Amino acid sequence: METSKEFEFRPAKETSRSKSPGGIVGRLSNFARNKARHSLSEKGSNSVGGSGGAGFDKPRKDLLKEFHKCKEAQDQRLDLSSIEITSIPSPIKELTQLTELFLYKNKLTCLPTEIGQLVNLKKLGLSENALTSLPDSLASLESLETLDLRHNKLTEVPSVIYKIGSLETLWLRYNRIVAVDEQIGNLSKLKMLDVRENKIRELPSAIGKLTSLVVCLVSYNHLTRVPEEIGDCHSLTQLDLQHNDLSELPYSIGKLVNLVRIGIRYNKIRCIPSELESCQQLEEFIVESNHLQLLPPNLLTMLPKIHTVNLSRNELTAFPAGGPQQFVSTVTINMEHNQISKIPIGIFSKATRLTKLNLKENELVSLPLDMGSWTSITELNLSTNQLKVLPEDIEKLVNLEILVLSNNQLKKLPNQIGNLNKLRELDLEENELETVPTEIGFLQHLTKLWVQSNKILTLPRSIGNLCSLQDLRLGENNLTAIPEEIGHLDSLKSLYLNDNSSLHNLPFELALCQSLEIMSIENSPLSQIPPEITAGGPSLVIQYLKMQGPYRGVVMNSQ
């Protein structure tokens, strides 16, 4: 079970092609987000146009009428998005009062030269078209601050862009750009640069001239290096380099003293420069899916604001050197899929804010003696290790809500597990358990209990006390019977009894589980139920239990 928080830079956060990036990007410019709120039918003193939601499919002459209306009303905003425009009539040059022009989601392959006469334009939205170039006349737009060219067919950054010195926000995501020219250094006012999802192999050294740059998003490209000059971008707070081919970071990264977030996951990085410890404002350290074998000593200790640490899918064999102090402010730790064999005693003794710990897919053979001190943890994932014993001190994790221990070598559970009063999910699949302790019945908030693929022979009668249980998975065990108390599970929705070769009957009380929606009985003989009934599947089996059992009247009256 995943316990790590998704890094906000990840594209999974942007499900709509027209959705603007979040965080500071959204604060820098929200015009793309709002474009769908306006329609041609809206009347206002400062806007005209539409987002296409009303089925607007006007011929050229009607488009000219919109220009005329806009000019007559001296509207400063014109939205002609989603109306399948293939070209812009030249009379647009007369709309010199415009400060915002939106042409999103059309079929434009080029822009007219006349657009350069809109000298008051501050925002120009052109995303989701088929543009391959821009007219040189755009250099005349000396007031332009925001240019959105996402989702076009650009193979290079149009040279005219480098001449628009007033630009503060430049979106070029989802194009086919292979390079960024040294002339990018001319854009001295640029605060946000988004070139994600292109084919860029290298950033120019002139990137260092962008001293006003606050957000730089370069993920999903083919970068093999980052220039040392990036360290001169001293205003940077967000640097996204995820999903590239980087093998190292420049030492100058330490000069980015205002950096709050750096995205370097899914690269080929083998070491982190110790200079990163100078980035005292960093709040997240996410280096998932690289080739790290260790971190610089005390690196995390020197970053006091770190609340999220994700070192998953690397080649670590031990915890980072830095002792308990390195996790003082940490809320989430994800170190899954490494080669860690030991959790140092006391490593979390100062982690009073730690709520989520994921050590899935490592080589742990035991848990530390002070495990009981992890009292703040709410989610603990220790699946796919080599654990043979769960310490009795597990009961001290009083805030635990999710416990994942699947795919280990556990032979028994401590009775103290029943003291985890807040536990909602317990995953014990693929272990070597032969019994489930009676104390399991004390877990009144448990909604999910997975114990499939063990060696369980019987269940305790206390299973019927799990009043919140919704998902019970008992498949692939050695069960010989199901306790009649299962009928008390009023919230049960899913029940898996498959692949229990010694299970020959089901209790009539199962018919009392009125919330049951899914039941699996494949490869369980159920020989004491007529074969023509079992052949009909779980639904018919439940009907049989209703009709044949002593609770027939109760069940029928509740229908």
Curated annotation (Swiss-Prot):
<dbReference type="InterPro" id="IPR032675">
    <property type="entry name" value="LRR_dom_sf"/>
</dbReference>
<comment type="similarity">
    <text>Belongs to the SHOC2 family.</text>
</comment>
<dbReference type="GO" id="GO:0031344">
    <property type="term" value="P:regulation of cell projection organization"/>
</dbReference>
<dbReference type="GO" id="GO:0008543">
    <property type="term" value="P:fibroblast growth factor receptor signaling pathway"/>
</dbReference>
<feature type="repeat" description="LRR 20">
    <location>
        <begin position="515"/>
        <end position="536"/>
    </location>
</feature>
<dbReference type="GO" id="GO:0007517">
    <property type="term" value="P:muscle organ development"/>
</dbReference>
<dbReference type="InterPro" id="IPR050715">
    <property type="entry name" value="LRR-SigEffector_domain"/>
</dbReference>
<feature type="compositionally biased region" description="Basic and acidic residues">
    <location>
        <begin position="1"/>
        <end position="17"/>
    </location>
</feature>
<dbReference type="Pfam" id="PF13855">
    <property type="entry name" value="LRR_8"/>
</dbReference>
<feature type="region of interest" description="Disordered">
    <location>
        <begin position="1"/>
        <end position="55"/>
    </location>
</feature>
<feature type="repeat" description="LRR 16">
    <location>
        <begin position="422"/>
        <end position="443"/>
    </location>
</feature>
<feature type="repeat" description="LRR 11">
    <location>
        <begin position="305"/>
        <end position="326"/>
    </location>
</feature>
<feature type="repeat" description="LRR 17">
    <location>
        <begin position="445"/>
        <end position="466"/>
    </location>
</feature>
<feature type="repeat" description="LRR 19">
    <location>
        <begin position="491"/>
        <end position="513"/>
    </location>
</feature>
<dbReference type="GO" id="GO:0031267">
    <property type="term" value="F:small GTPase binding"/>
</dbReference>
<dbReference type="Pfam" id="PF23598">
    <property type="entry name" value="LRR_14"/>
</dbReference>
<feature type="repeat" description="LRR 13">
    <location>
        <begin position="353"/>
        <end position="374"/>
    </location>
</feature>
<feature type="repeat" description="LRR 12">
    <location>
        <begin position="329"/>
        <end position="350"/>
    </location>
</feature>
<dbReference type="InterPro" id="IPR001611">
    <property type="entry name" value="Leu-rich_rpt"/>
</dbReference>
<dbReference type="GO" id="GO:0005225">
    <property type="term" value="F:volume-sensitive anion channel activity"/>
</dbReference>
<feature type="repeat" description="LRR 5">
    <location>
        <begin position="166"/>
        <end position="187"/>
    </location>
</feature>
<keyword id="KW-0677">Repeat</keyword>
<feature type="repeat" description="LRR 3">
    <location>
        <begin position="120"/>
        <end position="142"/>
    </location>
</feature>
<feature type="repeat" description="LRR 6">
    <location>
        <begin position="189"/>
        <end position="210"/>
    </location>
</feature>
<comment type="function">
    <text>Acts as a Ras effector and participates in MAPK pathway activation. Probably acts as a scaffolding protein in a protein phosphatase complex that specifically dephosphorylates Raf kinase and stimulates Raf activity at specialized signaling complexes upon Ras activation. Required for vulval development. Involved in fluid homeostasis. Plays a role in nicotinic acetylcholine receptor (nAChR)-mediated sensitivity to nicotine.</text>
</comment>
<dbReference type="GO" id="GO:0046579">
    <property type="term" value="P:positive regulation of Ras protein signal transduction"/>
</dbReference>
<feature type="repeat" description="LRR 2">
    <location>
        <begin position="97"/>
        <end position="118"/>
    </location>
</feature>
<feature type="repeat" description="LRR 10">
    <location>
        <begin position="281"/>
        <end position="302"/>
    </location>
</feature>
<protein>
    <recommendedName>
        <fullName>Leucine-rich repeat protein soc-2</fullName>
    </recommendedName>
</protein>
<feature type="repeat" description="LRR 4">
    <location>
        <begin position="143"/>
        <end position="164"/>
    </location>
</feature>
<feature type="repeat" description="LRR 14">
    <location>
        <begin position="376"/>
        <end position="397"/>
    </location>
</feature>
<dbReference type="InterPro" id="IPR055414">
    <property type="entry name" value="LRR_R13L4/SHOC2-like"/>
</dbReference>
<comment type="subunit">
    <text>Interacts with let-60.</text>
</comment>
<feature type="repeat" description="LRR 1">
    <location>
        <begin position="74"/>
        <end position="95"/>
    </location>
</feature>
<feature type="repeat" description="LRR 15">
    <location>
        <begin position="399"/>
        <end position="420"/>
    </location>
</feature>
<feature type="repeat" description="LRR 9">
    <location>
        <begin position="258"/>
        <end position="279"/>
    </location>
</feature>
<dbReference type="InterPro" id="IPR003591">
    <property type="entry name" value="Leu-rich_rpt_typical-subtyp"/>
</dbReference>
<dbReference type="Pfam" id="PF00560">
    <property type="entry name" value="LRR_1"/>
</dbReference>
<feature type="repeat" description="LRR 8">
    <location>
        <begin position="235"/>
        <end position="256"/>
    </location>
</feature>
<dbReference type="GO" id="GO:0035556">
    <property type="term" value="P:intracellular signal transduction"/>
</dbReference>
<keyword id="KW-0433">Leucine-rich repeat</keyword>
<feature type="repeat" description="LRR 7">
    <location>
        <begin position="212"/>
        <end position="233"/>
    </location>
</feature>
